[in-house]
């Protein structure tokens, strides 16, 4: 996927996920990083849609931050500066997001596609999180279609 396939907001979310990875000294961007980046933009579409669904985006973001803090850290000589990897699980979510965008006949991958990709291809930990908040594609799509 090329950078041109993403909207400005989705590029910002990916950059925020990378920055979070650096701040927490993780070696790779995980689904937790990306989900947190999507939820932490208070004026963003994803928090607005979750609020519309009766969810509390700030509470979910706080839980994600706790999950990120527990991820393995890489410090010292083992860490290559400015070298951040994307986990296979994020890659799977991005591919799912691209496929969703194509099915929706959208030219660009936007934040809602990224979020739906995370819902469609979650890791076990993320599936548990989404289940705990009763968030899935079936509940998210009606909120998305209402905007």
Features from the language model and the residues they span:
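Histone-fold recognition with a strong bias for associated Lys/Arg-rich disordered tails
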Residues: 1-147
């Amino acid at each position: 996927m090329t950078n041109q396939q993403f909207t400005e907001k989705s590029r910002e979310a990916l950059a925020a996920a990378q920055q979070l990875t650096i701040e927490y000294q993780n070696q790779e961007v995980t689904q937790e990083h990306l989900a947190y980046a999507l939820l932490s933009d208070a004026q963003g579409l994803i928090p607005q849609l979750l609020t519309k669904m009766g969810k509390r985006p700030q509470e979910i973001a706080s839980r994600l931050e706790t999950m990120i803090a527990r991820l393995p850290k890489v410090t010292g000589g083992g860490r290559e500066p400015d070298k951040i990897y994307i986990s296979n699980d994020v890659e799977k979510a991005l591919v799912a997001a691209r496929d969703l965008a194509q099915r929706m006949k959208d030219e660009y991958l936007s934040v809602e596609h990224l979020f739906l990709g995370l819902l469609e291809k979650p890791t076990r930990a993320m599936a548990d999180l989404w289940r705990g908040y009763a968030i899935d594609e079936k509940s998210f799509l009606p909120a998305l279609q209402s905007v």
